[in-house]
Amino acid sequence: MSSLYPIHPGVVVREQCLNPHGLGVVEGARLLGVSRQALSNLVTGRAGLSPEMAVRLAKALGGSDERWMQLQFAYDLAEVRKKSHTINVVPITSYKYAHSKPQAELFNS
């Protein structure tokens, strides 16, 4: 596992797509066919990358919509892992009900 923390896809859009081409949010939004607010929320990290935006970015820049979504997934997972100590669960294998019925019955109830 990499020790580098994943970058929010919006930062990638801003730093590697908009800025090098001298584009602001208004121009970028127009080219992508989205609202200024939608792109602003993405590049400032207030919103995540949607599958639709991933397709738009891939069409506008070339490349893969799946790669854009992988960036979002990596970022989201890293964010959840930061707070994983607050997530409390009971392992299913230790749950009493799991031992009281045959496995096949668990999924047919």
Model-derived regions: residue spans:
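A short, Lys/Arg-rich alpha-helix, primarily the initiator
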Residues: 1-23, 70, 106
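Hydrophobic side chains within well-formed alpha-helices
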Residues: 9, 64-65
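Short alpha-helical DNA-recognition segment
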Residues: 22-41
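The DNA-recognition helices of helix-turn-helix-type DNA-binding domains
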Residues: 35, 46, 61, 72-75
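Short, basic-rich loop-to-helix N-cap that marks the start of a DNA-contacting helix
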Residues: 46-59
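Short, charged recognition helix plus adjacent turn
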Residues: 67-109
